[in-house]
Amino acid sequence: MPDPAYVRDAFARIADRYVLTNHILSCGADLWWRHVVSSRIKAWQPTRLLDVASGTGDLALAIQRSCPGCEVIASDFCAEMLTHATRRGVTHTLVADALALPFPDASFDVVSVAFGLRNMADYPAALREMSRVIKPGGHLVILDFSLPTNLLRLPYRFYLHRILPHLAGWLTGHKDTYEYLGGSIEAFPAGTAMTGLLESCGLRQASFTPLTGGVVTLYQGDK
C-alpha cells in the first residue's frame, strides 16, 4: 500500500495543475463521473456530508451545487490541495487524515471519497473509520479507477503505463507522480473484492457500478 509521506508530497507538488491535468487526462470524463456521484447523493437529501480525500474539491463542489441545503465538509491530509479547494469555492475544509477522522461516531448522513481510497496506507482501516462516522441509515460512496474486464483492458493498460505518465509529466513537470498511478490501479481491489471489503468493514448491501467501460467504478455501502 502507498507510503503516506510520498503520497502527501506528490499531491502537494502537483496541486497547482491538478484540476486541469485531470480534465485533460480523462478527456473531460471526470466531470461526468462526479456528476453521477452527486446525482446519486442528491436523491438521499443529506443534511451533512463528509468528502474524504477531497483534494482540490472537485466532488465537494459538485455536491454543493446539487445539494444546496447540505453542509459539505471537505477533508484531506494535504493542506496544499485544500488551499485550492477553498479558492475554488468549497465552503468548509479541514486538514485531516482519513485514518483518524476528528469526528464523533454517527456524524454524517453520507461520506464520499473520489480517487482517494486507492492512495491510502490502509484500505480496511480507512473504510472502518469512514463507516464509524456515518449515521445509521447513511451511505458511503466511493469513486475510483479500475481495470476494464472487456476489450478495453489491454489498450487501457497501455495508456496507463506508456502514454499517461509522459503526458502528465509534460502537463505538471512531475512524471514520477503519475508513473505510480498505473501500478496503484492494478493493485487496488475492484468489483466484488471491494464490495466484500466494504461489508467486512461494517457496511451493508455493498454494490458496484462500472462507468465508462469499467475505467472507473462507483461503489456504495449502507450503514
PLM regions: where:
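Core SAM-dependent methyltransferase catalytic element
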Residues: 204-223
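Class I SAM-dependent methyltransferase SAM/SAH-binding core
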Residues: 48-100
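Conserved alpha-helix/loop element of class I SAM-dependent methyltransferases that forms part
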Residues: 27-46
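A short glycine-rich, Lys/Arg-flanked "PGG" loop and its adjoining helix->strand segment in the class I
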Residues: 124-139
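A short acidic, Gly/Pro-enriched loop at the edge of an enzyme's catalytic core
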Residues: 99-110
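A short SAM/SAH-binding and catalytic strip from SAM-dependent methyltransferases
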Residues: 109-123
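C-terminal alpha-helical "lid/dimerization" subdomain adjacent to the S-adenosyl-L-methionine
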Residues: 143, 147-197, 207
